[in-house]
């Protein structure tokens, strides 16, 4: 198979395939007599694994580890499961951080009248200035 065939079958671009090759994330393809890359089913499997692993949040280094496990006949499913659960824990931490950010933003938005006034509690709060302005006695 040539690179365009592999791109169609994996859903990756030719550029992405070459990038993964340059990074050493896939087995180097053989070259035909005219210098074109020649791919096998193994390449398709590695590239599909990379695409799908990236889609669920694995970074390039982690993808490389997964490809290495894929190619290791002595691998243990426990190793793959461990990496997967570590990724789940990382995603849960990110979700928690995002929820905290959301809550902070909602609190800021609630503090702002959102009118034509130049006074903006959101800007004041984010800049650290005038945070006592709203608490001045009248």
UniProtKB/Swiss-Prot annotation:
Disruption phenotype: Loss of copper-based induction of copA. Causes a mild defect in aerobic growth on CuSO(4), strongly impairs survival during anaerobic growth on CuSO(4).
Cited PROSITE patterns: HTH_MERR_1, HTH_MERR_2
Coiled-coil positions: none
Gene3D superfamilies per UniProt: 1.10.1660.10
UniProt remark on domains: It contains a N-terminal DNA binding region and a C-terminal metal binding region.
DNA-binding region positions on the chain: 4-23
Record's protein name: HTH-type transcriptional regulator CueR
Sample GO molecular function, one term: DNA-binding transcription factor activity
Function: Regulates the transcription of the copA and cuiD (cueO) genes. Detects cytoplasmic copper stress and activates transcription in response to increasing copper concentrations.
Subcellular location: Cytoplasm
Main location: cytoplasm
Subunit structure: Homodimer.
Binding site for Cu(+): 112, 120
């Amino acid at each position: 198979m040539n690179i365009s065939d592999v791109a169609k079958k994996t859903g990756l671009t030719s550029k992405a395939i070459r990038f993964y090759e340059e990074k050493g994330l896939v087995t180097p393809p053989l070259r035909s007599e005219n210098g074109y890359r020649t791919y096998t089913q193994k390449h398709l499997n590695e590239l599909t694994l990379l695409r799908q692993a990236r889609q669920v949040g694995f970074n390039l280094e982690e993808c490389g580890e997964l490809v290495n496990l894929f190619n290791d006949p002595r691998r243990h499913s426990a190793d793959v499961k461990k990496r997967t659960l570590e990724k789940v824990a990382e995603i849960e931490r990110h979700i928690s951080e995002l929820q905290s950010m959301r809550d902070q933003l909602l609190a800021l938005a609630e503090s702002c009248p959102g009118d034509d006034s130049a006074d903006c509690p959101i800007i004041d709060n984010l800049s650290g200035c005038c945070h006592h302005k709203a608490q001045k006695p009248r």
